[in-house]
Amino acid sequence: MTLDLDRIVAIDVHTHAEVGRTGEDGLLPEWREAAQKYFGEGGTPTVEEVAAYYRERNMLAVVFTVDAETVTGRAAVRNEEILEVAAANPDVLIPFASVDPNRPNAVDEVRRLIRDTAVRGFKFHPNVQAFFPNDRAFYPIYEAIEEAGLPALFHTGHSGIGTGLPGGGGIRLKYSNPMHVDDVAVDFPGLTIVLAHPSFPWQDEAISVALHKQQVYIDLSGWSPKYFPPQLVRYANTQLRDRVLFGSDFPLITPDRWLADFAQADFKDEVRPLILKENAVRLLGLR
């Protein structure tokens, strides 16, 4: 099936398939409950349900899971399931993979996915996966992704997962400072990087990294646009207008809610289509 980009109204670069066909769920129950309480929304969609939801809205969705089995002891939705469903729904789903970087065979698995599947990028969640992105032990992973010409998306900033729990449910926020990803951007200048979310409490750091490193993008997922820090809106309207991306964090924030609030936010008219679609078209090589 040929992708009809003219039909697409927006590209959501940040959505989650939460459960697998046979019940896989990579998050601890208390983490999921805390995140849903924090966001006031939620749900546990399968990959098929993500596809149906976005098809109704004439949107494309980058979809992934978070593999953190060495931390949680729980299997996430299988990458193969996401890839299979995306292949059956190419008009709506763009599959990213998640590989727990702490797995002994992580780089081999990344290379296998690149070699044998239609994976379009990789998602990392340093808080949940408990790693510093700039730990050189993980550099072979980035090298493989860079060689393949695929993007790497990193969670940055605060995490709704664990919020409000004693000890944050064991989640350490230090892992998600975007300055750790700055090292990765320096050492892998050919690697396209997406800093996911407004990176509170390190918003200025994220802006600086993206401004300084030409291959670094920012996605706007996980927050309602009415709460965006003013400096983020200012740079999205000006120097970073070509590297800011629409993302919702579905199902924790729906694109319906995000887009309604985006319509009221202080973005320039000429910048809105860049954020909603055109920047992602370029990032993902859709044209």
Regions found by a protein language model. Name each.
Residues 15-17, 65-66, 97-101, 123-126, ...:
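A cross-domain feature marking catalytic cores of carbohydrate-active enzymes
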Residues 26, 120-121, 134-245:
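Catalytic pocket-lining loop regions of alpha/beta-barrel enzymes
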Residues 44-50, 77-83, 106-108, 178-181, ...:
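Alpha-helical scaffolding within the catalytic cores
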Residues 17-21, 68-71, 101-105, 158-162, ...:
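Active-site environment of divalent metal-dependent phosphoester hydrolases
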Residues 1-16, 20-56, 60, 111, ...:
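Mid-to-C-terminal alpha-helical segments outside catalytic/metal-binding sites
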Residues 14, 82, 95, 113, ...:
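Conserved, mostly hydrophobic/aromatic
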